């Protein structure tokens, strides 16, 4: 297991209360040895005007996952902040849920890179993101 902080899924989800994460309905669903996953509904909260998943909502899910994964890689007195987010949208989604899977690309002392892939309910890749974070403290 790569994580330096050991939180349960319930503890991770509790951090989202009264935030954008809760408003968008994002829920952490799996914490593995080197992976963090979450789901987000595709509904009125996350649609763009034409009834499809908004790219900004996809980016918010990606940054949520990457930032929390980055936090799990810090020690007491440290935190992470996002420095760069890139998203490539592959497929439109209009309903259901999307699942985000976050894996590390680089874990340095001062910066990290995370790959976050979003899948629709049929398991098809709909978005690929990369998040860079800086370790503070």
Curated annotation (Swiss-Prot):
Its UniProt pathway annotation is:
Siderophore biosynthesis; enterobactin biosynthesis
Sorted alphabetically, which keywords does the UniProt record give?
Answer: Cytoplasm, Hydrolase
| Keyword Lyase part of the UniProt annotation | no
- EC number(s) per entry: 3.1.2.-
Question: Can you list the GO cellular component terms from the UniProt entry?
Answer: cytosol
Which principal EC class is assigned to this enzyme?
hydrolase
> Where does the source fall among the domains of life?
Bacteria
Quaternary form?
Homotetramer. Dimer of dimers. Interacts specifically with the aryl carrier protein (ArCP) domain of EntB.
Q: Which NCBIfam families match?
A: PRK10254.1, unchar_dom_1
Q: Which family does it belong to?
A: Belongs to the thioesterase PaaI family.
Name of the protein in its database record: Proofreading thioesterase EntH
Q: What organism, scientifically named, is this protein from?
A: Salmonella paratyphi A (strain AKU_12601)
């Amino acid at each position: 297991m790569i994580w330096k902080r050991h939180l349960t899924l319930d503890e991770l989800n509790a951090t989202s209360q009264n935030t954008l994460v809760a408003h968008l309905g994002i829920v952490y669903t799996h914490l593995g040895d080197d992976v963090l996953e979450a789901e987000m509904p595709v509904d009125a909260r996350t649609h763009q005007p034409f009834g499809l998943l908004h790219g900004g909502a996809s980016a918010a899910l990606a940054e949520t996952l990457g930032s929390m994964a980055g936090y799990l890689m810090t020690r007491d007195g440290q935190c992470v902040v996002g420095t760069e987010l890139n998203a490539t949208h592959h497929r439109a989604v209009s309903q259901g849920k999307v699942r985000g899977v976050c894996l590390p690309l680089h874990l340095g002392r001062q910066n990290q890179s995370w790959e976050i892939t979003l899948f629709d309910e049929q398991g098809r890749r709909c978005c690929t993101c990369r998040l860079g974070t800086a370790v503070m403290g």
